UniProtKB/Swiss-Prot annotation:
It comes from Homo sapiens (Human). One of its GO terms (biological process) is G1/S transition of mitotic cell cycle. Keywords: Cyclin. SMART domains: CYCLIN. This is Cyclin-I2. Pfam families: Cyclin_N. Residues 64-76, 83-101 have a biased composition (Low complexity). It comes from the Eukaryota. Belongs to the cyclin family. GO terms for cellular component: cyclin-dependent protein kinase holoenzyme complex; cytoplasm; nucleus. Residues 1-116 are annotated as: Disordered. The gene is CCNI2. GO terms for molecular function: cyclin-dependent protein serine/threonine kinase regulator activity. The keyword rRNA-binding does not apply.
Amino acid sequence: MASGAQLPPQPSSSEVSAVQSPGGRPGAGLEETALGVPLPPSPGEAPLPRSNRSRCPGTRQPGAASLHAASAAVPVRPRRGTAPAGKTADAVPAAAPEQAPRPAPQSRKPRNLEGDLDERRLLCHLQLAQDREARLWRGGKPQDEICDAFEEVVLWLLRLQNTFYFSQSTFNLALTIFGRLLISVKVKEKYLHCATITSLRLAAKVNEEEEFIPQVKDFTKHYGSDYSPNELLRMELAILDRLHWDLYIGTPLDFLTIFHALVVLSWPHVLELLPQRNPSLHVASLTRQLQHCMAGHQLLQFKGSTLALVIITLELERLMPGWCAPISDLLKKAQVGDMQYSCCKELVMQQLRSLQSSSCTDNFVSPAN
């Protein structure tokens, strides 16, 4: 009877051990949320977090009942030949074949759905970026009188030593903020340098962790020694006021990353044509091309999505000459007009040719010791 006294609390613990392995991940429910579909139950993962199982005892009622019946049947004289004991004894081996095939669907289903889920997720990100770009994009023609000065200051920013280890997206957002400013208002040439480094500081405030954002004095020491902290702060307020305190728009790098992922996901054999078959190295190379094109004064009139689309389609034409299917698919998803695309493509090709002999290096080098 001592063992019978311990039986009532055992069904829940045995139920947990039956559905969760000793090394099971406590955050298994997060995968279901990320994938957007419920994962199939398996012996390796619990269907609900521990806190929810205590509130929802009937979630796995059939399994709980069978396990309870099996454990309760053990102390009730199983070898006396009684009919109830024989039935409960048969129920234990009968339940084993039902659980045996469960791991197989779990290992197959996420892999079968993974491609579709990733593509849907990418298209969702693309749509959000396009909507935000359409809402914030003002358009307009760049100032012709600062054409050379603009290219010079952008190339200077790209040559900067990355003293504070800013990310690629931070530098790209800085160029985007600077370009939006020049489209929105006329900026005198003598203020271009100050506006450039201020755009970089604003981009760092948006993208970087708070502990990695340098103080104004440290920032001016490395990037703007000609300006006082007060001058930099006044320029920040001027840019924020002109851009309505809404700095984050879908950057060209955002669109480039999404387009590249869509191509690799929809056309997997493209990976065989990439340098070292490494998508990350390929994106880094395209990012350098993109940033160099953002130094082109005439390209300020195009949206970031259009510029990124042209960069990646030119690369696809180089890798797969004469094969138009991936390019047509991207053009449909990007929702870019034919005239805008053709005009931007011509200017991008000119810009890339003019920068082929340039000694400009990207700004993602570590500072010298």
